[in-house]
Amino acid sequence: MNITDEDLSKLKFHLNEVAKIKSKLGGCYTQYIFRRSTVDPIVVEFISNYLRKSDLYDQAHFFNLSIDSVKVGQKLPIKLVNFMNKFDFADEMRVSIDLEDLKTVSLVIEFDDEMVVKQLSIEIDE
């Protein structure tokens, strides 16, 4: 599914709203799932655990700020590049939110070796 500017705005807004609620509850935003092009469950588990235990300043704020500045044809924000370099990510980053009706909506950011964003897309898993 190709992403329009309107779709992207809606998804970013929703991510920010979920993040605000989670930060009020004192929990970090564990729905961020980073993955390689082929999913390695161990990698996903490792990242999830890292985020749960991390003492990063307000993860929800950190990632949402970064996601707001992701644009096709531009380099990934330095905060995201630095985070991903710690874990040797390949060419894709995925931000997922689980909705109440058991659907998972993901913003998929694909980038090249120079960390320039090649494509933004939305995937919905039911």
Language-model segments: residues:
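Phosphate/anion-contacting hairpin/loop surfaces
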Residues: 96
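Short helix/turn-capping signatures at newly exposed starts of structured segments
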Residues: 1-93, 102-104, 113-126
